[in-house]
């Protein structure tokens, strides 16, 4: 069976991405990162999601990039703001995060002799992060072609972003068609230890908007009624 490494955070998009990988018949290897994020409950969710989808193997790689600061998701001196629209790159952007994550996933994929890496990046209904754009995925694909044994031998590892052109509503509809239970997921940047969401950060607002537009009941549990 063909193998794939799937990056999972515990959130809505990456969980949908894992469901897509399963639907394609991949033998799935799930990879998460403990990078010093404040919303640590997403990793608790990710572990449960990996077990729910019966992945072949689930790994959590610990990184110390949070010590460098520079993002409201990792730096205790910076507050996660309420939703502010997508006019500029927000303070919740973690510098080079997807590049770091994909690089480690690429190494694991080589070790596993996997055909693909799947990431839940989307350039629609997103927070404006530069490493969630189609041109970024294309650039990393070029890197994978040039910098791996498989790539040099003509069997490059494919970098797949199946949600890249989907709105949040379209992603949710896709996930529901594949049987995803979104009540298991944690998307909030300010989620508490129980995984309850704040309802007001970028991620929460985009998630609420997605369920509303998809006309599907939002199963998210919030700290206070929103």
From Swiss-Prot:
Q: Where does Zn(2+) bind?
A: 188, 198, 201, 204
Residues annotated to bind ATP: 8-18
NCBIfam families to which the protein is assigned, alphabetical: 7-cyano-7-deazaguanine synthase QueC (TIGR00364)
Annotated PANTHER family: 7-CYANO-7-DEAZAGUANINE SYNTHASE
Q: Which domain of life is it from?
A: Bacteria
| Enzyme Commission identifier(s) | 6.3.4.20
InterPro entries for this protein: QueC, Rossmann-like_a/b/a_fold
What is the reaction catalyzed? 7-carboxy-7-deazaguanine + NH4(+) + ATP = 7-cyano-7-deazaguanine + ADP + phosphate + H2O + H(+)
> What cofactor requirement does the entry state?
Zn(2+)
Record's keyword annotation contains Ligase? yes
Q: Which UniProt keywords apply?
A: ATP-binding, Ligase, Metal-binding, Nucleotide-binding, Queuosine biosynthesis, Zinc
Cofactor binding note from Swiss-Prot or TrEMBL: Binds 1 zinc ion per subunit.
Would the keyword Metal-binding be found if you checked this record's keyword annotation? yes
Stated family? Belongs to the QueC family.
Main enzyme class = ligase
Q: Name one GO molecular function term.
A: ATP binding
Cross-referenced CDD domains, in alphabetical order?
A: QueC-like
Coiled-coil regions listed: none
The identity of this protein, by name, is 7-cyano-7-deazaguanine synthase
| Biological process according to GO | queuosine biosynthetic process
**Biological function:** Catalyzes the ATP-dependent conversion of 7-carboxy-7-deazaguanine (CDG) to 7-cyano-7-deazaguanine (preQ(0)).
Gene of origin? Answer: queC
Metabolic or biological pathway, per its Swiss-Prot or TrEMBL entry? Purine metabolism; 7-cyano-7-deazaguanine biosynthesis
């Amino acid at each position: 069976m063909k193998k794939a490494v799937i990056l999972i955070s515990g959130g809505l998009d990456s969980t949908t991405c894992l469901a897509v990988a399963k639907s394609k018949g991949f033998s799935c290897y799930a990879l998460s990162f403990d990078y010093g994020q404040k919303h640590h409950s997403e990793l608790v969710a990710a572990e449960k999601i990996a077990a729910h989808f019966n992945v072949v193997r689930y790994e959590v790689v610990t990184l110390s990039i949070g010590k460098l600061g520079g993002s409201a998701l990792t730096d205790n001196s910076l507050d996660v703001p309420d939703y502010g629209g997508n006019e500029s790159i927000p303070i919740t952007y973690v510098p080079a995060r997807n590049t770091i994550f994909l690089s480690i996933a690429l190494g694991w994929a080589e070790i596993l002799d996997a055909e693909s890496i799947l990431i839940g990046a989307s350039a629609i209904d997103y927070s404006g992060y530069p490493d969630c754009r189609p041109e970024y995925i294309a650039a990393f694909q070029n890197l994978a072609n040039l910098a791996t044994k498989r790539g040099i031998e003509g069997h490059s590892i494919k970098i797949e972003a199946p949600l890249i052109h989907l709105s949040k509503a379209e992603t949710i509809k896709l996930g529901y068609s594949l049987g995803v239970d979104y009540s298991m997921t944690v998307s909030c940047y300010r989620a508490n230890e129980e995984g309850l969401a704040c309802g007001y950060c970028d991620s929460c607002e985009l998630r609420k908007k997605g369920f509303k537009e998809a006309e599907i009941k939002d199963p998210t549990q919030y700290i206070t009624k929103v």
